Swiss-Prot record:
Protein's UniProt name: Sugar fermentation stimulation protein homolog
Domain of life of the native organism: Bacteria
Taxonomic lineage from the root: Bacteria, Bacillati, Bacillota, Clostridia, Eubacteriales
NCBIfam families reported for this sequence: sfsA
A single MF term (Gene Ontology): DNA binding
Family according to the record: Belongs to the SfsA family.
Listed InterPro entries: SfsA, SfsA_C, SfsA_N
PANTHER family given in the database record: SUGAR FERMENTATION STIMULATION PROTEIN A
Length: 233
């Protein structure tokens, strides 16, 4: 997946609130939009090397968007608002997943029951609904989701469980936005409700998938490089 826009090297200074951070670009402090409502405490540390997207539109509240962070010698994408869905959509369209190749139609933002899911796949009476979650928190090569409580995420899991119980197929795809994870686990420490809902969903037959991405700042790319297990014990 191509990382869109003009990327500029910068230095992280501090996070002002969930949506805005202070960064230093060419020696000048600038406001940057943070496209991720997670805590990101292990990534957004004073002095961290970052890449920001420069915006040309003058009607934006900030001139930059905080897109990549350097951590332990690798680049991490913190764009959870757009990147996970984009990379999943490209992979589906390109037929990269064997289990989804039989579906002839891909729809985005599909409403079922009381929730809107990222993707609906359809083919000759078959239906498969996918919710995508971006993972940025990795500790000891273990990815954890979420890194902040998410009632919306828990509700999605509950609705996917109902869909599966009604006889339709459903799955959760965790997109790990960095290359240094070998497994993904629910983050019980941060959101026990989400973790329990994930286990209930798995017991009901909801598929749990996780894909690791390599982020290349020089080439302006983020690509899925391998699938890893989701461990819920």
């Amino acid at each position: 997946m191509r990382i869109e826009g003009e990327l500029v090297k910068a230095k992280f200074v501090k996070r002002l609130n969930r949506f805005v951070a202070l960064v230093e670009v060419d020696g000048v402090q600038e406001f940057a939009h943070v496209p991720n409502t997670g805590r990101l405490k292990e990534l957004l540390v004073d002095g961290a090397a970052v890449m920001v997207r420069k915006y040309d539109k003058t009607d934006r509240k900030t001139r930059f968007g905080l897109i990549l962070v350097r951590k332990n010698g690798i680049w991490v994408s913190i764009d959870s608002a757009n990147a996970p869905n984009r990379i999943m959509y490209e992979a589906l369209v390109q037929g990269k997943f064997d289990k989804f190749r039989d579906y002839s139609e891909i729809r985005r933002e599909v409403t079922v029951l009381n929730s809107r899911f990222d993707f609906g796949l359809f083919s000759e009476g078959k239906e498969y609904y996918i919710e995508v979650k971006g993972v940025t928190l990795v500790e000891n090569r273990q990815g954890f989701f979420p890194d902040a409580p998410t009632q919306r995420g828990t509700r999605h899991l509950e609705e996917l469980t109902k869909i599966r119980q009604n006889g339709k197929e459903a799955g959760v795809a965790f997109i790990v936005q960095r290359e240094d994870a070998d497994v993904v686990r629910p983050n019980d420490r941060t959101d026990k409700n989400f973790a329990n809902a994930l286990r209930i969903a798995a017991e009901a037959g909801v598929d749990l998938m996780a894909y690791v991405c390599k982020v290349d700042a020089e080439q302006r790319r983020m690509d899925i490089v391998r699938e890893i297990p989701v461990i819920i014990k």
